[in-house]
Amino acid sequence: MNSSTDPTFSELNASFTNTPDTLFATSVSSDPSHGFGEEDYACGTFNCSPKEFVAFVLGPQTLPLYKAVLITIIFGGIFITGVVGNLLVCIVIIRHSAMHTATNYYLFSLAVSDLLYLLFGLPTEVFLYWHQYPDLFGMPFCKIRAFISEACTYVSVFTIVAFSMERFLAICHPLHLYAMVGFKRAIRIITALWIVSFISAIPFGLLSDIQYLNYPLDHSRIEESAFCSMSPKIVNEIPVFEVSFCIFFVIPMILIILLYGRMGAKIRSRTNQKLGVQQGTNNRETRNSQMRKKTVIRMLAAVVITFFVCWFPFHLQRLIFLYAKNMDNYLDINEALFSIAGFAYYVSCTVNPIVYSVMSRRYRVAFRELLCGKAVGAYYNSGFARDHSSFRESSAYDRVHSVHVRASQHPNKFETDSSSANRVLIKKTYSLPLPKNADSTVLSTTDIVIVLENSHTVCEEPKVENDIWIENEETCI
């Protein structure tokens, strides 16, 4: 949408801004005491027609063709990649029981929220570049779109934070995670964050409505100026944007930085300890370990940077509308920031499947299997299918040996009964060769192996009596 309002309209109680959700404007009312002349309205001394007045305040009804086409192509690419990527994540998690883990439940929640926002928000956003006003969808759609868009935004933020805390516990405090282990806990958390998000978005749905401009000469409402908006009077009286900025950006951003910073330090510390033990043994192994450590740290940094880049312009533009309308070059800054915020806002829905899912080898294999219509290799028959039954404390991305463990409560037999869940297994590590087909980008197992509660899983009896061979596999960090 275009921003073409003269700064002097702030004196007329006429101001507006554009956000990825709504266009804000106030009704214009004239006051003889203001003494505005021709330059103030740029359409004669109150002699402009209502149509000219609307065009002056809200900008052209349709953007220039080249700009509308370019934006449509860019947003169309974002829409296709975002919908396809998130759909693949959802289908893979639903189809494969091995993917029914607490971590993947968070990813599923994130994919669903991104899908909803892309479907409800992006098509309308593109349409507004071709037809900014009058609004053609009516008040019900205006309220529903504002409500769902805001709610899905909150769900995405909460899910990323919850997922980050899950990773933090897995890497830095595995014993605490064991005390809270279980799929039901993850489902309860996800359900709660969806409920809280939708409740938090209710004010945006209730306060959004079809707004109109008033013609300054006779104060009549200009029907052709209809647009979906939240009244600026309400925005000025109720700090909805400020609260949203603090709760759904500042606090999550601080938490994410602290959590991933701590995880990065833990990974670096464990890798350095392992390298100290390996000194003088295998230079190639040392180099590979260092490369894997850098890969993980870069990925952790990518999570923080992605969150900041995608969400900060959106909140910044809202704050500029509230507190900086009188600044120099406000209109140019607002228009540029609106384009950047809209692009980054929707790109986050496309980037999330890549950052949180596709970077995992497990997901890449599952995607190939889904697209090709057949299983790829023997990955599903090995460690892939066992991720839902065991959770291991992880350190750096290092090549590790298979771990030989024995159940402390059942020394003669490992549980084949599905009712034996949530038992700690005492680990004994042996220097066993790594299988040739094992993935090199795996996490090393350290002090504890935890069997997660899964009443529907029955572990097969291993060939070696009383023993379990936990194979190398990826753990999503």
Swiss-Prot record:
It comes from Drosophila melanogaster. Its main location: membrane. One of its GO terms (molecular function) is neuromedin U receptor activity. Glycans are attached at residues 2, 13. Residues 1-72, 131-145, 211-237, 317-335 are extracellular. SUPFAM superfamilies: Family A G protein-coupled receptor-like. The gene is CapaR. The keyword Cytoplasm does not apply. It is a multi-pass membrane protein. Belongs to the G-protein coupled receptor 1 family. Acts as a receptor for the neuropeptides CAP-1 and CAP-2, but not CAP-3. Probably a component of signal transduction pathway that leads to Malpighian tubule fluid secretion in response to these ligands. This is Neuropeptides capa receptor. The keyword Cell membrane applies. The lineage of its organism: Eukaryota, Metazoa, Ecdysozoa, Arthropoda, Hexapoda. Residues 94-109, 167-189, 259-295, 357-447 are cytoplasmic.
